[in-house]
Amino acid sequence: ISSRNAKDFYNLMDVYLDAVFNPRLLTDKRVFLQEGTRREIFNKDDEIQYQGVVYNEMKGAMSSSEEFIYQAMQEEMYPGNYPAFNSGGDPYEIIKLTYDELLDYYKRHYHPSNSFTVLYGDGDVDEELEHLDEFLSAYEYKEIPNKIGMTLAKDSKNFIERAYPNDVSDKHNYAYSFITGDIDNTRDSIMTEFLSKYLSYFSNSPLKKKIQEMGIASDLLSYSNYGYGNGNFTDINMILKDADSGKADIFKDAVEEELENIKAGRINGDIYDSALNLMDFTLKEFANTATKGIALALKAVAMWLFDKSPATAFVYNATLEELKKDQSTFINFVKDVHKDPKLIDFYPVKDFYKDRDEAERKALDEYKANLSDEELEALIKENEDLKAMQEAGDSKEALASIPTLKLSDLPRDIEKLPLEKISDSAYYSKEDSKICYLNLFFDISHIAEEDYVKVANLVDLLADIKTEKSSREKLETDIFKTTGAINFAASVVKNYKNGKLTPFVQCSAKFTKDKAVSAMKLIDEIIKYSDPSDEKVLKMNVLESVSDFDNNVLNIAPAIAMDVAKAQSLEKERLTLKLHGIEKFIHLKELKANFDELKDEEIKDYKRLMKTMFRKDGFISHYSFECRIAELDKAIAELEASLESIDAP
C-alpha cells in the first residue's frame, strides 16, 4: 500500500492488516466460491461449469505460450523445488482445492509471526511502528516451520523435448539455460545480468547478431532472474523464438561458441562498454517510479524470504567497479559458471489442452450424474446465494466501517510542480537525481491521419536503424556508451484547458550531466539523418513486433476490446489506436504476410515521413535534473533553431 497522505496511509494500513489476518474467507465460504473456484449451475438441465476469479485468470495466463514456456523452464531447471510449481495455480489443479484445505493452509501460515513488513518513505517511523504494534500486539508469537530449501537434481537430462500450446504456428522455441550462482551473492547476480545484456540486449550483441545473420528465428531473448531470484540461485536463460524444427543443435552451438569466445578473452569492447553503462543506469535508477517504495520492498523481500539479508539486494558498486577495471572478472565468472546447461526444444501442439478439457468435462458430467435431486438443488441454491451476494453489494453497516478522510484531512493547496520556464518551448524541473531525464515533443498534427500507423512503425525503428553518418551498429554503440537509452514513441496529448488534441512524436533520453551535449548530438543525428531503407532490419522489426503481439494478445485482449469500444465515441482513443494500438499491429501483420509486395511502398513512406515529422512548429522540450545544465539548454535551443517550419518544402 502507499499514500502521500499520512491519515490515509494509516487507514489503508488498518484495512490491509484486517483483510490479511481477519479475512471474511474464514467465516463465509462464498468468498472461496467467488475468488477461487466453484461448480456453477443455475438450472438443473444445464451443464456444470467451473468458474472463479483466480481459476479464470490462470486459464488466461496459461494459454500464453510465453507464460507456459517460462513455467516449463522452471520445472526443468529446478525439478521438485518450489520454482517448478506454478505459484499462480495451474487451473487444472485449482479445481481440486477444497474450502477446508484452504482454511487449514491459511491457519497454519497466515500469522504475523510468519510475515515480513517493510516501511518506506518520509513518514514518522516511530509513529508507524507504534501503529503497527497496536494491531500486532494482539497476537502471540509462534514458531512456524516455513523454511524453503532447495536441492538441485543430480544426473538430470541436459536435452529435453516438451510440447507447448500454439494454435497459430508450427514454429519451435528453444531454451538454453544454466545456473550461475547464489542469489545472496550480489556479485553473481550482477554478473549474470551483465552476461545476459552482453550476449543479446543490443542488435550488435555477439549472440543476437549471430542469430540474426543465421536467419533461423524471429528473435532471441535473454534474461536472468537478477533481483528476484529463484530462492537460492541465479540463472540465465536464452530463448530462440519461432524457429523451425531441427535447430536445437545449431542454437546450442551458437550459444556455446559465444560463451567460449568470452572464456578465451575474445570480447567485443564496444558492446562490453555499452552493457556496462546500461547496467550502471539500470542499477542507479532502479524503481525510479511513483511507487518506488513498493518496488524496493519487493526486491528486499525476495532475499528476506529465504533467510538472506534484504540489504544484499542493493549492494552493487563494488561489482561494477570490478567490471570497469578490466574484463578478467567477467571472463573468469563465465569460466566458473558455465556448467551443466539445459537445452529444451519446445515443439508446438494445436489444441494442447484438448484432452485435459475433455477429461474435465467428462468428470463434471459424471459428478452431476451421481448427484441426487436434493444434492443438485443444493448446488443450484449455493450458486444462487453467491449471485445474490454479488448483486446485493455491501451493506450500509459494512460501508460505514471503512475508514474515510475528512475534508480537513486534505491539503488545501494543490502541489505545484517545480517547473521553470526557460523559453516559450523549453522547460526544466528540479529533481533530486544524478541522472538527467530529457523529453522532446514534436507536434505531428500536420501529418495526414492515414499515415499514423506508419508513423507508429517508423518511430519504433528510430535509434535502431542506420543514419547517413553511422552504421546501425555504430549508432547503437554510441547511444549506450553515452546514454542510458534514447527512445521514440507516438502519442496523443489532450490540453485540458481548451480540450484540443495534439498528436506528438516524443523522444526520451537519459544521461549523466557530462554526457548531455553528446546525447543531444546523437538525437540530432537520429531525427535528421536516419535512413529507413534497410529491408532486412525492417523485416526483423516486423517479425519481432508481430511475434511479441501474438504471444501476449490473450493477456491483453480485454484491454484491446476496451480501447476499441472507447474509440467509437472518444476522439483521443480513436487516434491512439492508430499510433500505438491495435490498428498499428493490424498493419504490421499485413506487412509481415505480404512483405515482399509491400516493403518498397512502406520504405518510401518512411522516407517521406522522416522529412516532415520533426518540425519546429509546436516543439516542446523538458528535462529534469538536480540543477540547470547550461550546455544542455544551449544544445536544445540550437536543435530547435535548426528545425524547419511546417510550411517548408
Question: Residues of each region from the PLM?
Answer:
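An aromatic/glycine/proline-enriched structural segment found at the starts
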Residues: F116-H172, F286, R615, I620-P649
